[in-house]
């Protein structure tokens, strides 16, 4: 396990590090560094048409990389972020094609773990897909992750902080809200905070 200073140096040099979120471990790298992103795709054996999310540290960051945001976006942010929620918005021209595979949308994540948030604030935006080989279960245990990647990666260990449930993915890019992946935040949780939101059944 490396110190935060060393993890910052690895990220700054275009490397990838394993970091805890409130859900599962992620494999993080600098999002605006194409070679760093390519390195994560290769480590995970991830198909190139499978887009990455942007891990950011503020509401302003979300606005910086999206467009045509719904008027209730700030309410969702205030109610659930940072936390186990990924939101999908229309991407603006600041989002590199190597992040979202040239799609019209991009996902945003604000993990609720102090070390990871600090590193995102310092070196972000970062990509941070789950720390596992594609097709394998999401990474819950630091030592198992390092073993799975043949000890090619290092990071910050905090197994006890993880829920072990992936984040809910909420698509806000259309006229109605869609839950693309059910995680710990449910439709009922969202409606309790924002009762006027209209959901589309997937």
Label each region the model flagged.
Residues 1-202:
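Active-site-adjacent structural elements in enzyme catalytic cores
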């Amino acid at each position: 396990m490396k110190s935060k200073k060393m993890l910052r140096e690895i990220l700054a040099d275009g490397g990838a590090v394993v970091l805890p979120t409130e859900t599962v471990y992620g494999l993080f790298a600098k999002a605006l560094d194409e070679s760093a992103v390519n390195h994560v795709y290769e480590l995970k054996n991830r198909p190139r048409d499978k887009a990455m999310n942007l891990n950011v540290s503020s509401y302003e960051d979300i606005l910086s990389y999206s467009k045509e945001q719904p008027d209730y976006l700030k309410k969702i942010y205030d109610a659930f972020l940072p936390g186990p929620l990924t939101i999908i918005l229309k991407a603006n021209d600041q989002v590199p094609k190597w992040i979202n595979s040239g799609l019209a949308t991009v996902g945003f994540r604000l993990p609720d773990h102090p070390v990871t948030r600090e590193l995102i604030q310092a070196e972000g935006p970062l990509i941070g897909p789950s720390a596992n080989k594609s097709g394998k279960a999401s990474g819950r245990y630091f030592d198992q992750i390092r073993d799975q990647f043949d000890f090619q990666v290092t990071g910050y260990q905090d197994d006890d902080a993880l829920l072990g449930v992936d984040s809910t993915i909420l698509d806000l890019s259309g006229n109605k809200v869609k839950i693309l992946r059910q995680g710990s935040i449910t439709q009922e949780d969202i409606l309790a905070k924002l009762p006027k939101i209209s959901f589309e059944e997937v």
